[in-house]
Design a protein with these regions (language model features):
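Class I S-adenosyl-L-methionine
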Residues: 112-156
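A short acidic, Gly/Pro-enriched loop at the edge of an enzyme's catalytic core
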Residues: 60-74
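A short, conserved alpha-helix within the catalytic core of class I
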Residues: 82-96
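Conserved beta-strand signature within the Rossmann-like core of class I S-adenosyl-L-methionine
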Residues: 93, 97-110
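Residues lining the SAM
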Residues: 76-79
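Hydrophobic/aromatic beta-strand patches that form the interior of the parallel beta-sheet core
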Residues: 55-57, 105, 134
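Class I S-adenosyl-L-methionine-dependent methyltransferase module
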Residues: 1-53
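Conserved SAM-binding strand-loop segment of SAM-dependent methyltransferases
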Residues: 50-64
Length: 156
């Protein structure tokens, strides 16, 4: 947790004006919230792994679940954010999520610089002929302008 957490917090300090300080009031509170969440996860990890609640996996490889196993799948702060992974990676990862989920939600739809993801239009165009695709506004906004999510779901 040490150095990566310090690096992230330093980047946050340098970009404080890019954030909405409503739900979380300041950097100290943000750091406390994040570290508390990390400690909670780590305290549960070994038992959760033994109980198969945590399963190691790398998208876009095939998930170890049957088609349509889940009602909703969520990609949080990963897909569409890391455009360096490339268009094909994102299409394959989303396709695999849609194989096991009736609906997926991707949040946020901005890149690491809080700009609209370069590939959002291409991803929407790719999936919209086979799935219901929409961008929904959310009440949650931490990065300024970052209050939208992409929803892709199977037609019923």
């Amino acid at each position: 947790m040490g150095q990566p957490a310090l690096t992230v917090m330093q980047q946050m300090r340098e970009n404080m004006d890019n954030y909405v300080w409503k739900n979380i009031k300041n950097l100290d509170e943000l750091e406390n919230v994040r570290m508390s969440a990390m400690r909670l996860f780590l305290s549960d990890y070994e038992q959760g792994k033994a109980e198969k609640r945590y399963i190691f996996h790398e998208l876009p490889n095939r998930l170890p679940f049957e088609d349509g196993t889940f009602d909703i799948g969520l990609s949080s702060h990963f897909l569409l954010m890391y455009t360096v992974l490339g268009y094909d990676f994102h299409i394959q990862a989303i396709t695999e999520m849609l194989r096991v989920c009736k609906e997926i939600r991707i949040f946020p739809i901005v890149d690491l610089d809080a700009n609209k993801s370069d590939m959002i239009t291409d991803v929407i165009n790719y999936f919209s002929s086979r799935y219901h695709v929409e961008i929904r506004e959310t009440q949650y906004e931490f990065q300024k302008g970052d209050n939208k999510l992409l929803v892709i779901k199977h037609y019923e």
